[in-house]
């Protein structure tokens, strides 16, 4: 560890926030191009030399309060001026992630302007970084999904991709994943101590830069405050989702268990995406208001 940069020499003990905190993730990727390039290289399984340019298309003003448009902290990237990448970190399981991620992908894919030719639509790749297993019956560390013919496996198009990185399944990383150190990047996301960060950071320069940047921004009060706000927000969401599921079970007694739970879960997700936490709390306890919103949103 003697050759390790001095910025982390005195760091020890628990980290204040893990990289699964989406504000911290967004800050680190936006602050350090070396980290962003290394991470994208690992996710796409391509060499860093193949990455000629990376542009964040939805930058935020770091350290300032988020407005409603920025509340969902997905990272939109333009790779080499000809490929759109959307990366999102998600800790909570909404039970609707396939539909939700597909919606995000479709929005990003719809990049044509009036008068553009359809052939010019950018290849688009949505990458979900999850702290839960999407398909427990088919666990994978990193999976990529595309449109193809179910009989002969002919690709319909290579311009439409969905990938999922499961932070709970690092032990299932393939040799290809390990070749691009995606397993170490995943380990960095779930590292709980500075000692863990230092050990992982020795594996490559981008990982070292990531550890340095996490340490540096964690010392900035305005960044810490917003990381804490996001942590509390996620805790509130977890509580509200649990409450909503319990209410959904009650409704399910009369309209069918799965239908009742799914209906309320969809409403809660919709309200959370609009940052309407007060309304989320209300719908879990106010049946009349809940039915009013069901009708309003055709649920």
Residue ranges and their predicted role:
Residues 1-299:
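Elongated, amphipathic alpha-helical interaction scaffolds
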């Amino acid at each position: 560890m003697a050759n390790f940069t001095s910025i982390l020499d005195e760091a020890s003990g628990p980290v204040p926030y893990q990289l699964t905190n989406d504000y911290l993730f967004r800050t680190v990727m936006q602050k350090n191009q070396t980290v962003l390039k290394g991470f994208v290289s690992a996710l796409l399984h391509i060499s860093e030399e193949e990455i000629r340019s990376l542009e964040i298309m939805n930058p935020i003003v770091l350290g300032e309060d988020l407005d409603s448009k920025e509340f969902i902290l997905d990272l939109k990237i333009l790779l080499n001026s000809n490929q759109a990448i959307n990366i999102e970190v998600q800790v909570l399981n909404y039970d609707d992630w396939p539909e939700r991620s597909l919606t995000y992908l479709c929005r990003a894919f719809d990049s044509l302007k009036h008068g553009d030719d359809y052939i010019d639509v950018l290849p688009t790749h949505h990458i979900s970084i999850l702290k839960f297993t999407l398909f427990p019956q088919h666990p994978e560390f990193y999976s990529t999904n595309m449109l193809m013919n179910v009989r002969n496996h002919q690709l319909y198009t290579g311009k439409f991709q969905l990938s999922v990185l499961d932070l709970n399944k690092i032990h299932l990383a393939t040799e290809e994943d390990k070749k691009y150190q995606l397993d170490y990047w995943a380990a960095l996301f779930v590292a709980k101590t500075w000692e863990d960060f230092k050990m992982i950071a020795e594996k490559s320069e981008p990982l070292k830069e990531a550890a340095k940047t996490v340490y540096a921004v964690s010392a900035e009060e305005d960044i810490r405050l917003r990381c804490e706000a996001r942590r509390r927000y996620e805790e509130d969401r977890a509580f509200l989702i649990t409450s909503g599921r319990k209410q959904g079970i009650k409704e399910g007694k009369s309209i069918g268990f799965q239908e009742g739970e799914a209906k309320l879960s969809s409403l809660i997700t919709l309200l959370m995406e609009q940052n309407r936490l007060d309304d989320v709390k209300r719908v879990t306890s106010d049946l009349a208001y809940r039915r009013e919103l069901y009708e309003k949103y055709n649920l």
